[in-house]
Amino acid sequence: MGWLINPSFFFICTNLIYFSKYQLHSGVSSLRPNSFFKNDDMFRYNSKERRNFKLLKNYNKYVEDHHCIPKQFKNHTLIKILNFDINNSKNIYIMPNKKGKSILNLHPDTLVHQGYHYKYNMFVKEHLDYILLKPEYDEKKYEFWLFFNHLKDNLQFNNNIPWK
């Protein structure tokens, strides 16, 4: 009954139910070297399947794909060390745009994705740089995993991340 209280709950659950059939949410193990193979990720950024899903749900005019770790950091040293695929579907969060927030009747505090988000990107860069300073590979991997999940957990209502 959560969707009656908070309409955005339904929007998010729809995405989670559909994507969770195809994605493994395995925490630290998902950051193993070579774990993000391009050929076995049906819903990676700009894939045909991802576009078709949004068309099927009639979301295509109302949402944008947000990279949790922004594309501009695909060559960051930490991202390279961890062999993290920026375009993997685990790094993409479907977010409503301004029109979508209204049309989909989402909660007023729901974040919208409309173009660039400088403060968010600088926040991510600062943390990537900090994690890179950790001496051990496993420590870097673990800290990155914690940070990555923190970002994903806070993208709906902007509880603890800067935006715009």
Language-model features and meaning:
Residues 24-110:
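Betabetaalpha-Me/HNH-type nuclease active-site subdomain
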Residues 20-21:
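Short hydrophobic alpha-helical membrane-entry/anchor segments
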